[in-house]
Amino acid sequence: HKLDFGEFDEIDYSLIAIHTTLEDYRLAYFINQKLHVNLNKSIKEIQITVKEGEAHFSRFHYYEKKKEISWDLIQNKNEVIHQQKEENQSLFSNIIDLEAAKKVYMLPEFKKVEYFLKIENCEMNLNLLEIMNKLNTIDNVAMTYIVDTNRIKSKNNLIF
């Protein structure tokens, strides 16, 4: 018997990009009000290893038992603090440890997006345009759009 790994590549979620200046907890609060869901901050942040170290992204989660739909509000931008050694070319020639912050992204191909709303198992049950229209009524949400999942190069970052 042979396993076909193509079966695991099947995408059973929708992804909505959200452009906003809101903090994650405020956005989650407004989404809860507008969409009648109950997103709660997850204890387990999403961890991704980048060349500068470990990156952590906040996640708010809600599982709708009746419809078996999983909702996740995911931070796309964060910073990784990493150590840099710099030689001081002075009389005493010291090596200085510097901390540098580097911007990192959950999905690097979408650098302008602040958050993603990932909705799993939502094929027939939800109207994504209606969800986007409701998200767009939140103050400080500049724009939302459905992400073409075929354009995502870093799909593995969405498996958690």
Say what each PLM segment does.
Residues 2-9, 101-112:
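Short, flexible, solvent-exposed loop/turn segments with mixed acidic/basic and small polar residues
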Residues 50-99:
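Surface-exposed, low-hydrophobicity interaction/linker segments
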Residues 23-28, 66-70, 81-82, 123-129:
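Short, surface-exposed beta-strand/loop "edge" segments at domain boundaries and coil↔beta transitions
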